[in-house]
From Swiss-Prot:
Protein's UniProt name: Small ribosomal subunit protein eS28
GO process terms (BP): maturation of SSU-rRNA; ribosomal small subunit assembly; translation
Gene Ontology cellular component terms for the protein in this record: cytosolic small ribosomal subunit
GO MF terms, alphabetically ordered: structural constituent of ribosome
Provenance organism: Methanosarcina acetivorans (strain ATCC 35395 / DSM 2834 / JCM 12185 / C2A)
Domain of life: Archaea
Family annotation (Gene3D superfamilies): Nucleic acid-binding proteins
Family: Belongs to the eukaryotic ribosomal protein eS28 family.
Keyword terms of this UniProt record: Ribonucleoprotein, Ribosomal protein
Amino acid sequence: MLIMAEESTIGGFAAEVIDVIGNTGMHGEASQIQCRVLEGRDKGRVITRNCVGPVRIGDILMLLETSREAKKLTTR
């Protein structure tokens, strides 16, 4: 069940997960995802973020800010 709310009541901006890139963190506990911002001044922008916890394509996240992006994953 998706409940849309104003930014001032929850304190975030809705974003839809469009791709799960991979795992990051010391033990692989975080996922790097690409998400499309659904509301606010950056509406429609696709950004890369790190996310902790289970996430899959189509999930809706509430982002506190939409201007910050995660660095791209690198392999060693």
